[in-house]
Each structure stands twice: as structure tokens, then as C-alpha cells.
Design a protein with these regions (language model features):
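Conserved catalytic-core motifs of eukaryotic protein kinase domains, centered on the activation segment
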Residues: 22-26, 377
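Conserved alpha/beta core of the MobA/IspD/sugar-nucleotide pyrophosphorylase nucleotidyltransferase superfamily
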Residues: 3, 7, 173-274
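Conserved N-terminal catalytic core of the sugar/cofactor nucleotidyltransferase
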Residues: 1-10, 32, 36-122
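Conserved core of the sugar-phosphate nucleotidyltransferase
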Residues: 63, 70, 112-199, 206, ...
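A phosphate-binding catalytic loop at a beta-strand-loop-alpha-helix junction
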Residues: 10-22
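Short beta-strand/turn micro-motifs composed of small residues
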Residues: 15, 58, 106, 136-137
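Structural signal for interior beta-strand "rungs" in well-ordered beta-sheet cores
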Residues: 259-397
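Short glycine-enriched, charge-decorated loop/helix-capping segments at active-site entrances
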Residues: 26-32, 76, 194-197
Length: 397
């Protein structure tokens, strides 16, 4: 506990899985959801929950995962011998960062929210202060999941894997997500006592419940939203996670004052920022790094990434804004226009069939149809500068 009386938390994020079902050369946790690697979502959730002491457990040769987890620490799991073994791969970090609570999350479960993390920590810190808190959920099909068996008092008695469960236990609909909070003072001791006397010869984190109870500590369950605990192990599940993330982002946009005329056809990046009274037409895609001011209209079939759009601009239809596009107030970008690495001052019009790249365009300039800025001579890329109020005629290069 800190000097100010606030409880402390250390987080371990398990990210060493090979993800063989993804059939990809890329580590599973680096596959993006809403434009951000899955592990990046988990790390951001921890930050939102106020947890800054975190370590990602990765496999050998996963330097790219370490980069994605930065600035947080990483620990390497040499042999993949189960979830408890993975947590203990971070023993040095855990011991060096003693805390009231140890929370274990998964790098391939990107949709968990800070509110759920907060609820789990609150349950751990509320009398009778259980030694372990497990995040449970109630899926439509509980078939393959471990079951959470509760006692008459509502406490967690055991976690039973589906393959080991009796018919009565299989009838239980409350399932184990794998996410848990453990008493930080006893976590390493309990984890060290987990054995591997099972068919796979692995060390299961779920066994910590029985060990804690054997020491007289209670175990509790917090029930979460099934969407939040969706683990991504295949491309199909990646698509499911993307759909859930997009629904959240669409709702956030509309709740923030934007109008989406056909929400299901609009795709956002995790960091898209829209002002108030923005209107977005159908089939619009936002890549990472887009900032849109108030009262902007983005018409159908536009693609934006790495762009800034100031108040009152009109984009599209069928327009593309690439990284470095910076549009001033009231700028108009019409159909089949592409803007890249260009500053367009207020009132500029580029209405038809044009490419403006690596350019500075002065206020009020009008760029005629078919205009191309040709900046590259085969060796060097130069800057095109168009003055205020200029009129560039059609089919100009």
C-alpha cells in the first residue's frame, strides 16, 4: 500500500502464445484490432485503470512484441508449460514490484475494459478480502470453457476444466475467462506450489484457487461481459473482436455528437477523434491518427489516415486523405481527390480528380480538375508551394 493509503497493483500480461491457428508469421498479439495491436489495447486498459507497473510475458524471438508492450517491461518464457509457468516467468519483476494485488491478463484478449479491471480490484479489496478473484462470464455456448463452481454463500469453490467436469458441473453456465487478481503478498508463494500432475504436464493458473482455499483464503467471482473476454485464437475470432471494437467506437462517436448516416459501414481506428456535429456518410474508413474538427462533413466512400481536418471542411465523396494531410477551416475536397503530406490553408478547394502531395497551398486557392503536383524527380522529393488565392487550371501538372 502506498503512503497515501491507496492500494497498489502489479500486472502480468501473458503474450507468449504462438497463435498457430492464426496461420501467420506475425505473433498473435500483434494482430491489430481497430488499428492497434491487441497487446496495445490491453496495456492501454491497464493505464486507464491507473496501473503503471506491468510486465508482458513473451516468447523467445518476440522482440516485436516487446516493442509493442513498451515502455513496460518484458519477461521471456523459455518453455511453454502452462499459464502458471508463464506468470512465474515474470517472477523477478513481481518480486521487484511488491503490490497489494497481482492481476493477470492476456495479450490476446483486447476488449477488456478498465471498468472491469476496477471491479475486480474492488472485489479483492472488499471484506472478506478474498485471496483470489476470478473474472467469470456466461457465454451462449459454455461447452469448451472451464466452469466456475460456487458454494452456497456465492464464493468460488473450484474451477473445473470442461474435459474433467461431471454432467452436473457441465450444466453450470458460469465460465472461467482466465483473468484473475491474486493477493499480492501471497501470489508467488501460491504460484510456486502449483504442480503439473495433469495429462498435459503443465502448470495451470486455475490451481491457485484450490491452494488459496487450502490456506484459508476465500475466492470470489466477478461476472463480466462475454464480449470483453473474447480471446482471439483464429482469424474468425479476430474478425469478431474487430466487430465488437467497431460497435464500441461507433457508439462513442455518436454519443460524442457525430452523425453516422449508416453506422455499420463506417470503420474507425482506436484513436479517431471527431468534433461535434460531424456528419459521416456511408462506407467511410478512418485509419490511425485522424483528427476531425467540428461541423465537418465526410461524404461516402472516403478513406482517411494520419490526417487533420479543421472545422467546417467538406470531404468527398470518394476522397483519400493520406498521412500528413492538414486541412484548414472550410477546405473542400471533392470526388477522386488524394491529399498527402500537404498543408491546405483555410478555404482551399480541390474539387475534382486531383493529387496534391508534399505541398503548401495558400488560403482560398482553387485547384482545378485533373491537377497533379509532381514533386519527385527520381532522386529527390521537393515541395510544391501554391500561393494564396491562386487558381490552378484543369489538367495541370
Amino acid at each position: 500500500m502506498q503512503a497515501d493509503g491507496k492500494s497498489t497493483t502489479t500486472a502480468v500480461v501473458l503474450a507468449a502464445g504462438l497463435g498457430t491457428r492464426m496461420k501467420s508469421a506475425m505473433p498473435k498479439v500483434l494482430h491489430p484490432v481497430a488499428g492497434r495491436p491487441m497487446i496495445g489495447h490491453v496495456m492501454a486498459t491497464l493505464a486507464e485503470a491507473g496501473i503503471d507497473r506491468a510486465v508482458a510475458v513473451i516468447g523467445e524471438g518476440m522482440e516485436a512484441v516487446a516493442d509493442a508492450a513498451a515502455p513496460h517491461a518484458t519477461a521471456v518464457q523459455i518453455d511453454r508449460l502452462g499459464t502458471a509457468h508463464a506468470v512465474l516467468a515474470a517472477r523477478e519483476f513481481i518480486a521487484a514490484n511488491p503490490a497489494d494485488d497481482l492481476i493477470v491478463l492476456y495479450g490476446d484478449t483486447p476488449l477488456i475494459t478498465a471498468e472491469t479491471v476496477d471491479a475486480m480490484l474492488a472485489a479483492r479489496r472488499t471484506a472478506p478480502q478474498p485471496g483470489v478473484v476470478v473474472l467469470g462470464f456466461e457465454p451462449d455456448d459454455p461447452g469448451p470453457y472451464g466452469r466456475l463452481i460456487l458454494g452456497a454463500d456465492g464464493s468460488l469453490e473450484e474451477i473445473v476444466e470442461a474435459r474433467d467436469a461431471t454432467a452436473e458441473q457441465l450444466a453450470v453456465g458460469l465460465c472461467n475467462s482466465g483473468v484473475m487478481v491474486i493477493d499480492g503478498a501471497r501470489a508467488l508463494e501460491w504460484l510456486d506450489r502449483i504442480g503439473n500432475g495433469n495429462a498435459k504436464g503443465e502448470y495451470y493458473l486455475t490451481d491457485v484457487v484450490a491452494i488459496a482455499r487450502a490456506d484459508g483464503a476465500a475466492a470470489a467471482v466477478v461476472i463480466g461481459d462475454p464480449d470483453e473476454v473474447l480471446g482471439v485464437n483464429s482469424r474468425i475470432e479476430l474478425a469478431e473482436a474487430e466487430a465488437i471494437a467497431q460497435d464500441r467506437l461507433r457508439a462513442r462517436a455518436m454519443e460524442g455528437g457525430a452523425t453516422l448516416t449508416d453506422p455499420l459501414t463506417v470503420y474507425f481506428s482506436w484513436d479517431t477523434a471527431l468534433g461535434r456535429d460531424v456528419t459521416v456518410g456511408p462506407n467511410v474508413v478512418f485509419g490511425p491518427g485522424v483528427r476531425v474538427g467540428d461541423n465537418v462533413e465526410i461524404r461516402a466512400f472516403c478513406h482517411l489516415e494520419g490526417a487533420t481536418v479543421a472545422e467546417g471542411a467538406v470531404i468527398g465523396p470518394f476522397a483519400r486523405l493520406r498521412p500528413g494531410a492538414d486541412l484548414g477551416e472550410g477546405v473542400r475536397i471533392g470526388n477522386f481527390v488524394e491529399i498527402k503530406a500537404a498543408d491546405l490553408a483555410p478555404g482551399v478547394k480541390v474539387n475534382h480528380l486531383s493529387y496534391v502531395g508534399d505541398s503548401i497551398v495558400g488560403a482560398g486557392a482553387n485547384i482545378g480538375a485533373g491537377t497533379i503536383t509532381c514533386n519527385y524527380d527520381g532522386h529527390f522529393k521537393s515541395k510544391t508551394i501554391i500561393g494564396e488565392g491562386a487558381f490552378i487550371g484543369s489538367n495541370t501538372a
